[in-house]
Amino acid sequence: MSSRRKFIKKAALGTVGISTVFNTITATEKKAAITNTKKVKKPVIISTWRHGLAANEEAWKQLKKGVSPLDAIVAGVGIPESDPEVRSVGYGGLPDREGKVTLDACIMDKNSDCGSVSFLQSIKHPIAVAKKVMENTPHVMLSGEGALQFALSEGFKEENLLTEKSKLAWEKWLENSKYKPIINIENHDT
C-alpha cells in the first residue's frame, strides 16, 4: 500500500524529471513547438486507437460533403462500430463475463450539450443513440434497459452483436477466468 509520503515523494521526483526535460529543450525548439500548434486549422479529428483511423477518414469525407461536424463524427464512429474485426466497440466487440456485448458511447457538441449511453445491448451504433439522447431528451446519460428502450423508440433495431470470433474468444476466456462473481446479479452494472 502506498502512503501519502511515498506519493508526494514520487510526485516531486516526477516534477523534477519533467522540468529537467523541459530545461534541455532549446529556445528554438520551444518556439517551433508553440508555432506548430498555432498552425493547426479547424476542424481537427483525433482518435486514440488504430481503428479510429478509418473513423477519421469517414468523418473527413462527410465534412467535405458539407455534413455538420457532429453528424460527421457519428458517421465516422459508425465505421469501427460496424467492423466485426474491431474487438473493443460495436459489432464484434468482446462480450462481458455473461457473454453479452454491452456498449457505451458519448458525444458533445460545440455548445457543450452532451448525450451518452452505457450498458447498451443489441444496438450496433451506440454513438448514434448517444446523439439522440443529447438532442431528444433532457438527460445526459441513459443506461441499460432504459437506453435500449429509448433506442428502440427512436427507430433503432435490435441486432445480435456477438460474432462467432468474439464468442470463441469469450469461451476460451471462460476456461481460465478467475473472475470473482459479483454480488449484485439483478442486472445492475454498478
Put a short name on every predicted segment.
Residues G17-N23:
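Hydrophobic h-region of N-terminal signal peptides that target proteins for export
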Residues T24-I25, E57:
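Generic detector of bulky aromatic hydrophobic side chains
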Residues S2, K9-A12, V16-G17, K31-T190:
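Alpha/propeptide regions of enzymes that mature by internal proteolysis
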